[in-house]
Amino acid sequence: MRYQGITCAFILLAALLSGCGGEKRLPSVVIPGKEKPEVTPVVPEETPDAKVGEVLPLWSEGYLDIHSINTGRGESYFYIFPDGTTMLLDAGGALPGEVHDYGEGNSPGVPSKPNKDIPAADVILHYIQHFSPEVSKGALDYMMVSHYHSDHFGSVNSFFPSHPSGGFVLNSVAAVGAALKVGKLLDRGEFDDPPSSDWFSSTTNYNNYVKFAKWAATSQGTVREKVRVGANDQIVMVHKPSATDAFEVRNLAAGGYVWTGTGTESATRLPSTAELKKMGSSDAGQCGENVMSVALHVRLGAFDWFTGGDCQYNGRSTYAYKDIEAPIAKVMKKVEAMKANHHCTANTNSAELLAVLRPDVLVASSWRDVQPRAETMTRFIKANSEVKIFATNLTDNNKATLASQGFDIGRMSAISGHIVLRVHPSGSRFWVYVLDDSDESYKVSKAFGPYNCQ
C-alpha cells in the first residue's frame, strides 16, 4: 500500500507545473480561514486562555512555543520563537508499527497517530500549518536534523512516493520540506565526517536527504549549513531580531563535538575521522550515530530548555568517548524543561547529566513499546523529586513492564498526546498543554501551570 496523503497531491501538482517549462517550487499550502489572521501588536500579560476540551489558542507575539508533535513514528519538535521565527527540529519518518516488522530482537512500534493512513510527514505538515504564525508566511525559517536515523529524518521505502522532479522519496524531512519553503537546513554535516557505524551499514537514507537538500537549494533557495558547535548566532530570530535580548539558542553539540564553555570553542573526544574509518563498522570502538546528535540550549529570560537528540553513553565503561553526555554536562546548568535524550530509553540521560540539568518538566518522545524506561525515569526523579513527566506514547505492554518493575505509572502527568510548552514573554513562567492526538483538532486534554522559572 502506498500513502495517499498530501504527499501524493504534491506529485500531481508538480507534474502540472513541470509542463509549463522549467522547474518550479511546490507551493506551500494555505490554511483555509487563516489567509490574513488578525495580529495584535500588544503582548498579553497572561497566556491566551487555553481550556480543556477546546482547541489550543495560537501563539502570541513575545511567547516561546515548543511543540512535541506525536506521529507515533519518531520524533518531531516545532518551535516558534518570540518574534514568530519558526524551526522544525526533526520530522520522524520511521515506518508505521502497524505495517512494519522491526525484526527479531527489536521492540515493536506504538500505534500511529492519529492513524496509519496519514503519513507522518502529513501529520507534521498539518500541525505546522495550523499553528504557524502569520509572520512566517507559511514557510519554515529553520529545519534541523539532529542526526541521521530514520525516526528523526526519514527512511527510503517503496511505501512512500517519489518527488516527480527532485527524484527523492517523499518522507519525513524531505516531504515536509517539499511542501513548505525552508530558509536554512541545519545538520551535523557530512555523514562520513566523522563516520558512525551506521554510515558503514547504509547511506541510502542519507543520500535521499542530500538529494532533497540539493533540490531545495535550487528550487526554493534553501541554504544547507553545518551546525557550528558553540555558536549562539546561527539560530536567531529573523523577523524581529531586536524584539528581545533575553532569547538565545546555543549550539551545544554536533558530530561528536561539544562546546567547551569558552567563547564559541568546541572540542571532541572521539577518534579522528581517519581512525574511525579505519576501524570499520564491527570494531568495538566504533561510535553509533546517536553520539553524533545535535544538542541545543534554548533560553528565554529565566526559562531554560535542553534538547539533545539521541545523545547517550552506551559503551562508556570501555570507551569513555562514547559518553557524549559527560562533556555536555560540564557546560550546562539547571533547566526548567528538557526533551529526554534518545526517547527516554536505556543507556541515556545519565545520572551525571541529570544532576546538572534537574528539569522540572520532562518530555519523552517515545515511539517504541520499550520507551520510556523505568530506570531512566527513576533517574530523573532522583535528580528532581518534583519533576513532571510527559510521555507522548505508552503501550499496554510497557505499562505492564513498568508495573512489574515497581514504577508507578500514576507518577506520569501524561502518557499520550502532543505536548506543548508555552513560555511567557518575560521568561518568568511557563505552561504545559497536552493535546489530543487521536485526530487533528488540537484540542487541549490536560493543562498544567504556570510553573515559575528560576
What residue spans do the PLM features occupy?
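C-terminal motif of bacterial Sec signal peptides marking the signal peptidase cleavage site
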Residues: 16-19
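Flexible, acidic/histidine-containing loops and adjacent segments that form or flank the divalent-metal
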Residues: 32-33, 38-65, 71-73, 127-130, ...
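Active-site metal-binding motif and surrounding structural segment of the metallo-beta-lactamase
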Residues: 82-87, 93-185, 327-345, 356-362
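Long, structured stretches of catalytic cores involved in phosphate-ester chemistry, encompassing
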Residues: 186-187, 317, 323-418
